[in-house]
Regions:
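Extended beta-strand/beta-hairpin segments
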Residues: 1-45, 54-136
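Alpha-helical metal-binding/catalytic segments enriched in His/Glu/Asp
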Residues: 49-50
Length: 136
């Protein structure tokens, strides 16, 4: 079993909070100015989790990964608590990688490995797309 995760979150002013977990820190700001809002941080966490999985899977397969970019769009409910109701993630992968290997890496992240996705409500609509470039 993995060790429990611990963190500390301290209110600074207005709706700005500073958090720390081990050596890592974050500033959360409801207005999204001093740092991401909590919901933006959740979206960053999801995109980051999937990106790390995809990079790890493609590298483990010794594929020619040269770059990865994610664009995430999250739709939110109009009523409180304005939860995320749909997520669309577009992956842009740079390198000479077969499309089926990219799709496999994305699917493995979504279906098996991404702990952030598996911690979210599973009734959220979820779609992914990808494009490949050979870029510099």
């Amino acid at each position: 079993m993995k060790a429990p995760m611990t963190l500390e979150l301290v209110w600074e002013h207005d709706l700005v909070l500073k958090g720390r977990s081990g050596d890592a820190g974050i500033v959360l700001d409801s207005a999204g100015q001093a740092g991401p809002s909590p919901v933006q941080a959740l979206a960053f966490a999801l995109a980051g989790c999937m990106a790390m999985d995809v990079v790890h899977i493609l590298r483990k397969g010794r594929l020619d990964l040269r770059g990865l970019k994610i664009d995430l769009t999250a739709e939110r409910a109009p009523e409180d608590p304005h939860r995320i109701t749909a997520v669309a993630i577009a992956f842009t992968v740079t390198g000479e990688i077969p499309k089926d290997q990219i799709q496999r890496a994305i699917d493995l992240s979504h279906e098996k490995y991404c702990s952030v996705w598996h911690s979210m409500r599973q009734d959220i609509s979820f779609t992914t797309t990808f494009s490949v470039g050979t870029g510099s």
